[in-house]
């Protein structure tokens, strides 16, 4: 089934400006992106901007505003997809896909023009997409997950165009996994010198939602290590947000390399900030028994912090164990040290020996 390409939607989306902006499309963008019309298939396409008559020599062609063209395009998409589902149910032969090819090629430009002119209530766009999803939820073999992804991306798109601080200059061949990084980069670059925390200009829930929907980090492959500094700078080393974000990313098990690299990054920041073990445990939400049980993924980050801390000076071993026992108690400390085996068997042995010595001093028999 042919669907609007999320990558193309992202490329177009990043180009959008404020919803209420009346500025014309940049000429460079128009030259790079031939999507210069939002007219539906019955009107045709000849490179004339939406809202103008397609053919001045043909008075029968109807003038449409960008918003009207967009709504018509979405209605048309719903109709075609539902018609396709019905045809499959009834065993009808597949219809030619020329109309859907048109929508895939030109539909995004209608969105761009619609959002630039703001001539209709943007909430109507969300309703239209919701309607599309509702009608297709129970239709067989329509790749509803893809539709939901398009829906989520478009909602993110609508939200972002109202935030100039997080827009970026696009490249038409950009892949979806670059979208979150583009927003982060832009937030960092556009932060005023007087604002110590550029993160405030970044819509964290939106970025989280984007990554949840598209698993952007899964596609980063070898690029993650070169982007860690950018990522950290964007949050201005706000380790509370970084830790929360990492816990969410850690649910993407295939991205072990990124998770490990970010844990190292966080640990080094905390060490530079001279954070105590108790402070880091609090940041990660694992300082209490209940919090520890709920945030076991964050405990992995904590173990990495302990390893990095001990590696900087192995003479700190006894003090580290003392603080661990004070913060977590002997049982949870033992569990944390056991997890150290997967990080560094050698460091596990060193800290476990210190732990055994401490337990003997307090009259407790080591395990």
UniProtKB/Swiss-Prot annotation:
Sequence motif dEER, location on chain: 61-64
Compartments where located: Secreted; Host cell
Region feature (Disordered): 33-65
Compositional bias ranges of the Basic and acidic residues kind: 54-65
GO annotation, cellular component aspect: extracellular region; host cell
Coiled-coil segments on the chain, per record: none
Keyword Nucleotide-binding annotated: no
Induction: Expressed in spores as well as during host plant infection.
Note: The ATR5 effector protein is a polymorphic member of the RXLR class and displays copy-number variation among different isolates of H.arabidopsidis.
Role noted for this protein: Secreted effector that acts as an elicitor of hypersensitive response (HR) specifically on plants carrying defense protein RPP5.
Protein name: Avirulence protein ATR5
Gene transcribed to yield this protein: ATR5
């Amino acid at each position: 089934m042919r669907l609007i390409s999320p990558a193309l939607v992202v490329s177009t989306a990043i180009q959008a400006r404020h919803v209420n902006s009346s500025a014309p499309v940049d000429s460079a963008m128009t030259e790079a992106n031939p999507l210069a019309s939002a007219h539906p298939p019955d009107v045709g396409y000849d490179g004339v901007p939406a809202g103008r008559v397609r053919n001045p020599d043909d008075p029968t062609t109807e003038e449409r505003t960008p918003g009207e063209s967009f709504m018509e395009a979405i209605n048309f998409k719903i109709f075609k997809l539902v018609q396709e589902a019905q045809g499959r149910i009834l065993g009808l032969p597949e219809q030619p896909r020329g109309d859907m090819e048109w929508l895939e090629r030109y539909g995004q430009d209608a969105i761009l023009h619609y959002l630039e002119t703001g001539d209709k209530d943007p909430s109507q766009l969300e309703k239209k997409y919701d309607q599309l999803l509702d009608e297709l939820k129970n239709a067989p073999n329509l790749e509803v997950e893809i539709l939901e992804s398009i829906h989520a991306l478009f909602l993110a798109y609508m939200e972002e165009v109202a935030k100039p601080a997080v827009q970026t200059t696009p490249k038409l061949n950009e892949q979806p996994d670059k979208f979150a990084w583009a927003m982060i980069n832009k937030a960092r670059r556009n932060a005023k010198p007087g604002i110590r925390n550029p993160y405030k200009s970044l819509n964290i829930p939106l970025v989280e939602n984007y990554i949840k929907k598209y698993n952007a980090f899964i596609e980063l492959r070898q690029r993650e290590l070169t982007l860690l500094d950018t990522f950290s700078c964007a949050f201005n080393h706000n380790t509370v947000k970084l830790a929360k974000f990492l816990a969410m990313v850690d649910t993407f098990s295939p991205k072990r390399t990124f998770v490990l690299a970010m844990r190292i990054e966080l640990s080094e920041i905390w060490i530079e900030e001279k954070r105590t073990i108790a402070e880091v445990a609090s940041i990660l939400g694992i300082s209490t028994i209940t919090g520890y049980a709920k945030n076991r993924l964050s405990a992995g980050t904590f173990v990495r912090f302990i390893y990095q801390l001990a590696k900087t000076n192995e003479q700190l071993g006894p003090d580290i164990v003392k603080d661990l026992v004070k913060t977590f108690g002997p049982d949870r400390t033992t569990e944390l040290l056991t997890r150290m085996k997967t990080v560094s068997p050698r460091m596990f042995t060193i800290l476990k020996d210190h732990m055994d010595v401490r337990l003997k001093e307090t009259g407790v028999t080591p395990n």
